[in-house]
Amino acid sequence: MAALLDRVSGTVSPSFFFQNMWLVLITAPNSRIPALNSLARRLPKMESEDSQSSTGTPFRPCLGGGPSRTPLGDRALTPPLDHPPLAGVAHIAGEDIGLMIRGFAAALEDSQILVQRGILDLLTTTLKIDSQAFKATRWADQILLMRAVTGVVLRRDLSLSRRLYSWLLGPSDNSDVQIAYLKEHSLELLRVALKAEMDEQSTESVDRQRPFKIFISLLDKWEIGHSLTEVLVLDAFAALQVSLRPDDHDEVSRIDPASIRA
């Protein structure tokens, strides 16, 4: 499969090839691992803002990208207006960058940890959260990806959690630098994504509990949990009060109070 993909990639344009790779991630679960192997070799890195500003790399308009209001009905979901709707990624991902985001999000829902790990590796190496390519995507697509990415903490797998933390906190090992990176690039999107999911009125108990479990799991990483608690805890309790139903009581009672106090 990998050899076939390599031959195909050499005969078509990059944008056409990668568009079909995103479709493979969405529609062909059994082919995700070969697709990820090919993407890991061929997908160019999309530099961070600092790297782009220092090198003067030009950006091209990205059709369908850029901030926009979403149909989620929350003014808080409107993105900051200082993100330029430009990115040098249209020739890679194609005109619909949202297709790339949806491909990543679909693969992150895969039951195989190897697939989830491969997507997180791609995100941390080629689509960093501080890159112009990521910030040029639609706000709704950013939220979609954030919801899918944060869901990996529910697997309780250290390799997945470590990659998630790296994407949210940046490449530095210094806690102060990580917190500064989180507040500048990740925190607001993380807050909005979790709050939107908390406010959804799902009929399924598992779906209603999911964002709260993610919130509690993220508290395990102090650099994330401390800042996230400051901006989300009141909204979380308000949403919990609205959405809690009798059949949820047993699940809530099993939550460790120490994790909340942390």
Sequence positions of predicted segments:
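Structural marker for long, regular alpha helices in very large eukaryotic proteins
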Residues: 1-27, 31-50, 58, 64-262
